[in-house]
From Swiss-Prot:
Coiled coil: none annotated. This is Flagellar hook-basal body complex protein FliE. Keywords: Bacterial flagellum. Belongs to the FliE family. One of its GO terms (cellular component) is bacterial-type flagellum basal body. Transmembrane segments: none annotated. Signal peptide: none annotated. One of its GO terms (biological process) is bacterial-type flagellum-dependent cell motility. InterPro entries: FliE. It comes from Bordetella petrii (strain ATCC BAA-461 / DSM 12804 / CCUG 43448). It is found in: Bacterial flagellum basal body. Its main location: other. Pfam families: FliE (PF02049).
């Protein structure tokens, strides 16, 4: 049984090596395969989109519960509402800290 497990791992390793070799033969360098660092603005935008999506999902689930949709429990609605509330509060705190940092930097003399 252990031998079959090892042969499965070896076959997976061979497949992974083949994929890497194919990528390198197509002119793709390992540096291009590595994820690129995200900019602060892009990360902030993705975070705001996640907060918005959480709020929309919680609102939709609340409406579904109000309409009596099957499979939607009050527990799930309350948990989603709390998740969206925490996400929004976190976003507000990040905004407040960014504003405070901007004010501090703008008050510095050059």
């Amino acid at each position: 049984m252990a031998v079959s497990g090892l042969s499965g791992i070896e076959s997976m390793l061979q497949q992974m090596r083949a994929v890497v070799q194919a990528a390198q033969s197509n002119g793709v360098s390992p540096a291009e395969l590595a994820p690129q660092p995200a900019s602060f603005a892009a990360e902030l935008q993705r975070s705001l989109q996640r907060v918005s999506a959480a709020q929309i999902a919680a609102t939709n689930q609340g409406k579904a519960y109000e309409l009596g949709a099957p499979g939607v429990s009050l527990n799930d609605v309350m948990i989603d509402l709390q998740k969206s509330s925490i996400a929004f509060q976190t976003a507000v705190q990040v905004r407040n800290r960014l504003v405070a940092a901007y004010k501090e930097i703008s008050a510095m003399s050059v």
